[in-house]
């Protein structure tokens, strides 16, 4: 790969390799090389600029969870080494809450949770990132209710006026990556499925998902079958019935020894004015950042499905 060390076999090898090097091998200082000085890292809870802040956050996490592992489940990617590549990296993380930190007093609880990180890299350096961590899964396993944890964190940050601002179109910062993915058919297929779901066409679920589909959701929840898919998306959309749904990035891939798969980064922006996943309507303006992965295949004579 042009601009990358020949130690990497391909782009997924680079992404998985530097993740292990930074976290598990304690090569935190390598972030000066692997992350650009002015990188923009967006998560639902904040927008962070600069690799120095990333280094500080990494050290704080490892102080609280010193045995953390990051197991790469998949890297769905697009682009070229010459123009830059975007990876959507799905991780299953394990950790023990061994020290006091942002998640409260040490609980000794063993955790398992997922993260998806969309990272743009060129010349062996990441310069733009969108990061989603399953915070509900983390706090629930420690012993918090998600709402109580959020309220406690806001209080510790100095109250609503002083707490970190969540990601919204108003707080987002521009980064160097301007791409929208690729035109692979599997990315297009998954994007169409999600648009139909967000357009209230829930009949697409039994039509396009295998009846034995396994699905993973926030809170560390695993579902099986059409019902779980329907319940999650119905409940989410019902909470924001008039919100605008947008697909910001889509990737599809067909790789040897792998099923066809897709990664979609999407946003839902509008008022919380419906009953659903988040309880009684509050009228609050909400911006939801989401990243979804899907694998496609067929069983017997069945049509290709998720």
Task: For every predicted segment, state its role.
Residues 1-306:
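C-terminal and inter-domain tail/linker signature
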């Amino acid at each position: 790969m042009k601009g990358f060390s020949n130690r990497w076999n391909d782009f997924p090898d680079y992404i998985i390799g530097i993740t292990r090097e930074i976290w598990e091998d304690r090569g935190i200082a390598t972030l000066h090389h692997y992350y650009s000085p002015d990188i923009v890292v967006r998560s639902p809870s904040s927008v962070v600029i600069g690799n120095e802040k990333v280094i500080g956050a990494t050290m704080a996490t490892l102080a609280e969870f010193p045995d953390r592992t990051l197991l790469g489940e998949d890297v769905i990617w697009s682009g070229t080494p010459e123009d830059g590549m975007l990876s959507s990296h799905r991780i299953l993380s394990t950790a023990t809450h061994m020290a006091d930190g942002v998640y409260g007093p040490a609980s000794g609880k063993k955790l398992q949770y997922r993260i998806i990180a969309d990272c743009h890299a060129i010349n062996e350096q990441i310069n733009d990132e969108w990061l989603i961590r399953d915070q509900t899964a983390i706090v629930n396993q420690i012993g918090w209710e998600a709402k109580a944890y959020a309220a406690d964190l806001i209080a510790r940050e100095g109250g609503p006026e002083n707490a970190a601002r969540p990601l919204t179109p108003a707080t987002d910062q521009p980064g160097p990556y301007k791409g929208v993915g690729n035109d692979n058919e599997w990315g297009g297929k998954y994007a169409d499925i999600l648009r139909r779901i967000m357009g209230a066409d829930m009949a697409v679920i039994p039509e396009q998902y295998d009846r034995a589909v396994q699905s993973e959701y926030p809170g560390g929840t695993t579902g099986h079958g059409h019902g779980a898919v329907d319940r999650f998306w119905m409940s989410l959309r019902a909470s924001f019935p008039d919100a605008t749904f947008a697909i910001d990035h889509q990737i599809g891939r067909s790789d040897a020894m792998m099923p066809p798969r897709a990664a979609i980064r999407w946003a839902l922006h509008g008022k919380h004015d419906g009953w659903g996943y988040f309880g009684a309507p509050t009228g609050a303006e909400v911006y939801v950042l989401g990243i979804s992965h899907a694998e496609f295949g067929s069983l017997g004579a069945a049509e290709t499905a998720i």
